[in-house]
Design a protein with these regions (language model features):
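Generic structural signal for small/hydrophobic residues in well-ordered secondary structure
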Residues: 7-8, 45, 86, 105
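Short, well-structured N-terminal submotif of metal-dependent ribonuclease cores
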Residues: 1-38, 51-66, 108, 117
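Alpha-helix capping/helix-boundary segments
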Residues: 9, 41, 82, 101, ...
Length: 128
C-alpha cells in the first residue's frame, strides 16, 4: 500500500518520538508499504527552521539523503492535478501545507499518516 506521511509523522518517525502511534509506526516500518513524503513537507520544515520554530541537526540536503532516502521514503512531487484538487477543497483546514498534503493524498488515493484531527473532515483514509 502507498502511504503519505504528514510532516509531523515523518519528523516523529525519524526522531523515534513516542508521540508517533504504534499503528502509524508499524505502517511506516512495514516492508510491504511504499512510503511517500510530500515536497510540501520539506518546504514546511525549511520555513519552520528558518523562523526558529523547528530545530534539526542537519541541513535539508542531509535530511533528504539520510532520513528520507535512507528510510526508503519516496518524495512526492507537486503535480498540477494536486493543485486542481487543492483549489476545490473546502476550508475545514486552514494550514496551506496540510491542505496540499490532503490534496495529494486525495488525488493519489493514498492513506495519510497523521494525528491532525482536521484531516477527518475530508474524504481521505487516515492512519493513526
Amino acid at each position: 500500500m502507498k502511504l503519505l506521511l504528514d510532516t509531523h509523522a515523518f519528523l516523529w518517525f525519524i526522531e523515534g518520538n513516542q508521540n508517533l502511534s504504534l499503528t502509524a509506526k508499524n505502517a511506516i516500518k512495514s516492508p510491504t508499504n511504499q512510503r511517500y513524503l510530500s515536497i510540501a513537507s520539506l518546504w514546511e520544515i525549511a520555513i519552520k527552521v528558518s523562523i526558529g520554530k523547528l530545530e534539526i541537526c542537519m541541513n535539508l540536503t542531509e535530511l533528504v539523503n539520510r532520513e528520507v532516502y535512507g528510510n526508503a521514503i519516496n518524495l512526492l512531487e507537486i503535480q498540477s492535478q494536486h493543485l486542481d484538487t487543492l483549489a476545490a477543497l473546502p476550508f475545514h483546514h486552514k494550514d496551506p501545507f496540510d491542505r496540499l498534503i490532503l490534496a495529494q493524498g486525495l488525488t493519489e488515493k493514498m492513506p495519510i499518516i497523521t494525528k491532525d484531527n482536521l484531516f477527518a473532515n475530508y474524504p481521505v483514509t487516515l492512519i493513526w
